[in-house]
C-alpha cells in the first residue's frame, strides 16, 4: 500500500539521487526512481523495498517520448507525485573551452537542460493536480552563479536551471506548487569521475586535502525543502563546505 507522499527522483543510480532515495525512504515516502543503469536501480530497489514501496524506471531523460511514456505508465499507487527532484545531470571536460570536444558540450546541454525540461513538462499536470505541498527541486550548482575556469557549458547549463526555476515559480503562482534551485558546491560523488572520463587520479585530486560535502548532505537539504509547511517556498539554496569559498577574479599576468 502506497504512503501518502511520493517522490520522483531522476539520476537515482548514484550520488545525490541515490542518497535522496535513502533519506526519503527513511521518512516513509514512496519512491519513483529513474536512471539509465538498470542494474543499479534494481539493487537500490532491493535495498529499500523492505522500508517503502519502490518503483524503478530505466530512463534516459534526454528522450522526451520515453519520459512522457514513463510518466503515463506510472502505477496508480505512484501516480500522485508530491515532489519531483530533477537530479540527473553531469559535467564533462574540465579543460578550457577551446580544448573541449563539441560532443561533450552537446551532451551536457541535452542532459542538464533538455532532460530537466522533459521531466518537468511531463510531470507538471500531476504536480499541479496535487496542489498545495507539491514541490519541484531542481539540482543546480554554484557553477550556475559563479564563473571559474573549465566551467564553460556546464556552468551555463546550471545558470539555465537557476533561471528556469525562478521563471517556473512565477508561472506556477496560485497552484500551490513550490520550486527550488538547490545549488551545491564541491561534493564527493561519482560526478567528478564522470567529468574526468574515468581518470580516478584526477578525480581524487579534487578532494585531496579538503573536506567536501557528502551526497547525504545534499539529500538532507532536499528533504528539508520538500517538507516545509505548504505556505513556504525556498527559491534557492546555495550550499558549500566550510573549506570552500569563491575564487578571486582570474588575471592574466606576464
Swiss-Prot record:
<dbReference type="GO" id="GO:0016491">
    <property type="term" value="F:oxidoreductase activity"/>
</dbReference>
<comment type="pathway">
    <text>Organosulfur degradation.</text>
</comment>
<feature type="binding site">
    <location>
        <begin position="8"/>
        <end position="32"/>
    </location>
    <ligand>
        <name>NADP(+)</name>
    </ligand>
</feature>
<comment type="subunit">
    <text>Homodimer and heterotetramer.</text>
</comment>
<dbReference type="Pfam" id="PF00106">
    <property type="entry name" value="adh_short"/>
</dbReference>
<comment type="similarity">
    <text>Belongs to the short-chain dehydrogenases/reductases (SDR) family.</text>
</comment>
<feature type="binding site">
    <location>
        <position position="141"/>
    </location>
    <ligand>
        <name>substrate</name>
    </ligand>
</feature>
<keyword id="KW-0521">NADP</keyword>
<dbReference type="InterPro" id="IPR020904">
    <property type="entry name" value="Sc_DH/Rdtase_CS"/>
</dbReference>
<feature type="active site" description="Proton acceptor">
    <location>
        <position position="154"/>
    </location>
</feature>
<dbReference type="InterPro" id="IPR036291">
    <property type="entry name" value="NAD(P)-bd_dom_sf"/>
</dbReference>
<comment type="function">
    <text>Catalyzes the formation of isethionate from 2-sulfoacetaldehyde in the deaminative pathway of taurine. The enzyme is specific for NADPH; NADH is not a substrate.</text>
</comment>
<keyword id="KW-0560">Oxidoreductase</keyword>
<protein>
    <recommendedName>
        <fullName>Sulfoacetaldehyde reductase</fullName>
        <ecNumber>1.1.1.313</ecNumber>
    </recommendedName>
</protein>
<dbReference type="InterPro" id="IPR002347">
    <property type="entry name" value="SDR_fam"/>
</dbReference>
Amino acid at each position: 500500500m502506497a504512503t501518502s507522499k511520493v517522490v520522483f527522483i531522476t539520476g537515482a543510480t548514484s550520488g545525490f539521487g541515490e542518497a535522496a532515495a535513502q533519506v526519503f525512504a527513511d521518512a516513509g515516502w514512496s519512491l519513483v526512481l529513474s536512471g539509465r543503469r538498470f542494474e543499479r536501480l534494481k539493487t537500490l530497489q532491493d535495498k529499500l523495498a523492505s522500508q517503502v514501496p519502490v518503483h524503478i524506471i530505466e530512463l534516459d531523460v534526454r528522450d522526451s517520448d520515453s519520459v512522457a511514456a514513463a510518466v503515463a505508465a506510472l502505477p496508480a499507487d505512484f501516480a500522485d507525485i508530491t515532489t519531483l527532484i530533477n537530479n540527473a545531470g553531469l559535467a564533462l571536460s574540465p579543460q578550457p573551452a577551446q580544448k573541449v570536444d563539441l560532443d561533450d558540450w552537446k551532451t551536457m546541454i541535452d542532459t542538464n537542460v533538455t532532460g530537466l525540461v522533459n521531466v518537468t513538462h511531463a510531470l507538471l499536470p500531476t504536480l499541479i493536480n496535487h496542489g498545495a505541498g507539491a514541490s519541484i527541486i531542481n539540482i543546480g550548482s554554484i557553477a550556475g552563479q559563479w564563473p571559474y575556469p573549465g566551467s564553460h557549458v556546464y556552468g551555463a547549463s546550471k545558470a539555465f536551471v537557476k533561471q528556469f526555476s525562478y521563471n517556473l515559480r512565477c508561472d506556477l503562482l496560485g497552484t500551490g506548487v513550490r520550486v527550488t534551485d538547490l545549488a551545491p558546491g564541491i561534493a564527493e560523488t561519482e560526478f567528478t569521475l564522470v567529468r574526468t572520463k574515468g581518470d580516478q587520479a584526477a578525480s581524487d585530486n579534487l578532494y585531496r586535502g579538503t573536506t567536501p560535502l557528502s551526497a547525504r548532505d545534499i539529500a538532507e537539504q532536499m528533504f528539508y525543502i520538500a517538507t516545509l509547511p505548504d505556505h513556504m517556498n525556498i527559491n534557492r539554496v546555495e550550499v558549500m563546505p566550510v573549506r570552500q569559498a569563491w575564487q578571486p577574479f582570474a588575471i592574466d599576468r606576464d
